[in-house]
Amino acid sequence: MKHTDIITKLNLEQKCALLSGDTVFTTRGYKNAGVPSITLSDGPNGVRKQAGAADHLGLNPSVPATCFPTAATVACSWDPALGEEIGRAMGEEAAAQEVAVLLGPGLNTKRSPLCGRNFEYFSEDPYLSGKMAAAYVRGIQSEGISACPKHFAVNSQELRRMASDSVVDERTLRELYLTGFEIVVKEAHPKALMSSYNLINGIYANENAHLLQDILREEWGFDGAVVTDWGGSNDHALGVKNGSTLEMPAPGGDAVRELLAAVRSGKITEADVDDRLDELLTLVLDTHAAVERHSRSFDADAHHALARRAAGESVVLLKNDDALLPLAEGTRVAVIGDFAETPRYQGAGSSAVNSIKVDTFLDCLSDSGLHSVGFAPGFDRQGKPDAAKQAEAVALAAKADAVLLCLGLDEIKESEGLDRADMKLADNQIELLQAVREANPNTVVIVNAGASLETPWLAHCKALVYGALGGQAGAGAMLDVLNGKLNPGGKLAETWANAYADTPARDHFAGPGRTVQYREGLYVGYRYYQTAGVPVAFPFGHGLSYTQFAYSDLHADAHSATLTVTNTGDRAGAEIVQLYVAKPNAEIFRPAQELKAFAKVQLAAGESKTVTLTLDDKAFRYRNTRTDSWEVEGGTYELRVGASSADIRLTAAVEVIGTDALNPYAGKALPHYQSGKVQTVPDAEWETLLGRPIPDDRVKIDRNMTLGELNHGRSPLGWLVWAVLTALLNASYKKGKPDLNVLFQYNMPLRALAKMTNGAISMGMVDGIVMEVQGFWVIGLVRVIFEAVKNVILNAQLENRLRNS
């Protein structure tokens, strides 16, 4: 241990107390023992340190900070160097605000387009996610503070996120959902990592020994602190035993007593507590020293400029018929769409930043070189039909050379705590597009959304530009692209399917009950569409430019590929060169191809550059569940180099030496996984891949019953709580603004009452509530009252002892 000198000064109760938070965003400290308290804070695309009363959902005001583009946006830049710059700026702002741990980045795999929090995550591909997240972590930690990558792991939905069980086969777990985290841990060495809310194969992530000990700490060598998601601890003692360091936010005295009792009963040992405390002290002492050294200032203007550059480099040009873009200087434009006036530039929830400033499309238009003939909102933001607004917009469109039509998803469509209902734009926006296009065929659609959309309306626009959620400076960056000041170089980090019905997890997202079956296995995103031969609207890695690029002279072996890329157009631009690995006629089933390297290349008009793409130890491996290790199938592989997953320009065959492991699927009937057509995998085949029966999906009346499931109980009071929460949710939907507090409560298990109330409610009181919900009303009420009195007395005694020590 590194900190024996401090640990030996503390008694067991003090040590146990340090392993849970003091307030919503601070740890406990003991000045006499030389242990300072530190502050943790959201978020993944900017610092969200709350100024007054703290809450984990971003409901109360926070200190102004730079709002950078979200991870889903910056992933489209395919530029780790840019990600590192953003991370460095966020780390600087965090340290200036005395934040020691910045809770991000998020790198959950985008299993489904409907996950309401996809705007916070990088990609459907673990390699791209891992490389981008590692860059953010390096940048943040260059300032001496800690990043905290999240949510570890298999956390791909918001519905019942604190109580759902992600049922996934081991190979898919390792190859798809953990590889991004593996890259981050091994390449960027984060000082902290956040465990996810959910269970993984029946065991909560925060107490999952296979996840935290076997893989994270032993196999990957992680020696930092594992922090729970806020309220995400189920069994605090098991978490400590199996590798979880710090329970947040502030569970109060009950958490301390739980650990004390666990040590005394032999459930865990004092050595377990000491190991976790040693990890925590390393985090606390290192980051506290960095915060103390900081000047408490940063260059807000420079960070705004960086935010604008990041947004611009992440813009994806999806369609550009007749080379409508870029627009020449002086072009008369009609600006239409509510988002031009009130931009959607970030997501809702714990990542929401109180931006220092926010550029709007209308504000930046005067400096763009374009001539505005006027602005019309065109549609109601929450989707209500408005014929007058549409008529005004159509009349304005007829007066212009081109229309800049700003469309997108509103605040209720994508948010923490809420999954999307569909992949569609609102009907009133589509109707407006059709009407505007009739008035002016030179219609440019600008989309602001944190995830992919269905585009049946694509024929009604001449150009389509995806700005995602561009942060506080995204509007100016978009105009830089539209007027040609910046040549778009972004490419999609997720596939845009033609329809939700085409997506691989359509029948199992987000699960009808507590169990969420990851039945599609390895076939997520482009891995599915290309293997199963499903057409898409826009493939993974797609993005157009105002210039053209030629690929030539590919030379490759099992370690690297070298080629020449030439800008054959008349203006400078950036090309993202992508390398996919394929094994035709493989014995071990696998996706048709997988991204294994990429590089972003800046080229002047007419310039050629040699590009070398290096293949690492993950290029040819697969997880063999029979040998429980990484293996390589030997033989001939194809290295496919191209401008997108569907636009392969050059290929090379390479011979790879295998490990000669036995086929883990020998003798097993897995036809859907062999073909990749996994939308309709039958139960028997899924159980064969899983290696066990499909778990029971019934709601149980226990500590992990969510408030949104109380209608399954036997208590009138429980039914009343459920009815009130449901009514409040429906009211917020009608207003068009998510009520994050109600959403959190709706998906919150009963045990979280003891984890989120700073000790006001104990787990004993929760057990009394469970008894009431089970129908034992009188006995349950008596227990709640008894445990409440007991909790007040014990908390007062504990706090008195801790203060005096």
Predicted segments, located by residue:
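Glycoside hydrolase catalytic-domain context in secreted enzymes
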Residues: 1-622, 636-641, 645, 758-760, ...
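Intrinsically disordered regions, especially transient/low-confidence alpha-helical propensity segments
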Residues: 75, 227, 493, 627, ...
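Terminal connector regions
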Residues: 617-664
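Charged, amphipathic alpha-helical linkers/stalks
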Residues: 652-724
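Long, compositionally biased, glycine/small-hydrophobic-enriched stretches that function as flexible linkers
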Residues: 693-805
